[in-house]
């Protein structure tokens, strides 16, 4: 049963946990060039992959009835019957226990953020995802917790990293942007099958989601630009060359919008991300650019 359990952890979505590395990307050269720092963050990344995987299993157990009649989600291991609820619960408890024990051994801050992340998602699965607007805000908070956990992961070796409030806000809005896209695509997938929609989706319309997505996209770019333009005031190092990464962020946002408005198959945003080569390439280019610029100091 290893394969169904692994699939239930949704490894494709673990890419979200890469936000743990953001604080290190925007730190000083001496921190970026230390392999030890990257290894500790890799450990933190693995822990959050376990936590997020446990959350996905929990969500699939709770949504079992609706997933079974959903045109896409019916293929998930639990909904399709490949993984029994009993086995899923056992895997959930084991993975959660191991992840939290590992988090405790990194630092108090990291453990607190990891526990907070799980509690937030537990509340989301049980209640908050049924409340329109609150559901997408939870998504944004989850990304912020991941980012802050990157700072907590390095406290084990007494490294104190700081991160700009503007960057945190930009990350929050980017996550909300992705959540709105997901809502939009899910509505389109089930547009002729209203019975399949979650209750909160009835409060959303395509026009509303298109408008709010555009607004949030603009706010994401705005706060990232504010962060870059004020980098010398918000961190212990100055590098005005980071301004050249703004076009990459603009491209990523506009590419997402282009894809969803030309997606005839109405795929979920997570699937779109991994299928669009320009989007993947631009994300990699952004990371390489940040490392290259900051390492040149």
Predicted regions and their residues:
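Topogenic membrane-insertion module of multi-pass membrane proteins
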Residues: 1-68, 81-91
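Multi-pass membrane catalytic core of lipid/isoprenoid biosynthesis enzymes
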Residues: 64, 69-114, 161, 165-176, ...
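Long, highly hydrophobic alpha-helical transmembrane signal-anchor segments
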Residues: 16, 20-38, 128-165
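C-terminal membrane-associated helical module and adjoining short loops/tails
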Residues: 2-6, 13, 126, 144, ...
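Short, aromatic-rich membrane-interface segments at the entry and exit
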Residues: 36-37, 108-114, 132-134, 163-167, ...
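Signature of alpha-helical transmembrane segments in polytopic membrane proteins
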Residues: 21-31, 37-55, 95-104, 155, ...
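Generic alpha-helical transmembrane segments of integral inner-membrane proteins
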Residues: 18-22, 42-53, 90-101, 115, ...
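Acidic (Asp/Glu-rich) catalytic motifs at the cytosolic membrane interface
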Residues: 51-79, 134, 178-188, 254-255
